[in-house]
Amino acid sequence: MYSNRKECPRRVKSFDSVNSGLDENQINNEFNKSTYIKIEDNKEYSENVCERGKASVIFSLKNEIGGLVKALKLFQEKHVNLIHIESRKSKRRNSEFEIFVDCDSNREQLNEIFQLLKPHVNVISMSPPENFTVQEDDMESVPWFPKKISDLDKCANRVLMYGSDLDADHPGFKDNVYRKRRKYFADVAMSYKYGDPIPHIEFTEEEIQTWGTVFRELNKLYPTHACREYLKNLPLLSKHCGYREDNIPQLEDVSRFLRERTGFTIRPVAGYLSPRDFLAGLAFRVFHCTQYVRHDSDPLNTPEPDTCHELLGHVPLLAEPSFAQFSQEIGLASLGASDEAVQKLATCYFFTVEFGLCKQEGKLKVYGAGLLSSISELKHSLSGNAKVKPFDPMVTCNQECIITSFQELYFVSESFEEAKEKMREFAKTIQRPFGLKYNPFTQSVDILKDTKSIAMVVRELRHELDIVNDALNKMNKQLGV
């Protein structure tokens, strides 16, 4: 538990509130014995002072005489000045009490005390020194990541395949007209910069027919296969963005719609991005979206994500606040993470956002975009023949992702909220020397690597809580409470 003493002075409790197992005289005697804890100035102490600041430590001792003196002696041995000490009854166990200590220390001293206290206490938490910051050496090992939404210009064009570069087994490989069209879409995406309106596309008759076939066949399955959130948002897209069998929606219209619903925006992309670059976009509520249409020789199948997949699979759920938050949090967890961690996050994304199932009213429903844009696999996933397991990020992150055929296994969540909570816990296992907080006002990420930046977040949270408290008070007055 962190406590910023400078921002929130704490009232000292009397020792009368401490568990009766240690009476007032015993506790006062222990404090009298510990008066030597204050460190006198000396040469050794002065030479070891660096980057000092006020820090707070909370530890819980068992009900035994002498335990407090033993613990406080560790501070003396490490030449740490104690500024303030107080006790309080433990909320965890009646047989224990907690000691709160304000001290003047640097990072190294605090780490040493933490290690020394652990064998002797049951609970321990601490806040770092007020002027603590992550060392630059720790930051140098962190992979580059975008700090603000405009930084996506630096990574959105790092596509793995470009324009007319198609694999030999692609349906359009020998179709020069199709390849030329693909290059056109790629050039449009490569020319796009943050803040630009997405160019209006005049789709060909063949492209509209292909879209219409996919749209018509999938809409036959959605009422029985898609989750309720998808079914709620699809009619809104028809109304506001022109989702129709005879019309391919424009990305600019879709982007404006999403911005009003969940804050997500669309950015055109020329092709496949690396997992790191794609997830980075999600951190800023930006979805990289292709505009090209699959080849008309096989409209019900595509070897790669196309605009049918993006607009019919992803967009309806990006218009759902809870799902949008889930997607963004996966993106935020990826920023500055190691390659191994990013791959695990990408795999979890694949088996949730792309191929996820959920339970609604006792039945399995689909929310994964890869399923919602594939007629054959959408049928298969709920046929009863597909293998299904509960979503667990620690397990899911090791599952093989299959692109050329149906998945061997699908993961089911009770709800988006459950999946989000599990991913939050999983994200805590990712090693980074800093924390991150998304700033929706500047569309940037705040890097939390020192006590000053963390204190600022605390102030913001207090303001938000004041607003909530004020609203509750007004409701209580209206209710006569």
UniProtKB/Swiss-Prot annotation:
Annotated positions binding L-tryptophan: Y272, R294, T302, S373, I403
Pathway(s) served: Aromatic compound metabolism; serotonin biosynthesis; serotonin from L-tryptophan: step 1/2
The protein's required cofactors: Fe(2+)
Keywords for the protein's UniProt record, in alphabetical order: Iron, Metal-binding, Monooxygenase, Oxidoreductase, Serotonin biosynthesis
GO biological process, any: platelet degranulation
Enzyme class, spelled out: oxidoreductase
Function summary: Oxidizes L-tryptophan to 5-hydroxy-l-tryptophan in the rate-determining step of serotonin biosynthesis.
UniProt protein name: Tryptophan 5-hydroxylase
Organism whose genome encodes this protein: Xenopus laevis (African clawed frog)
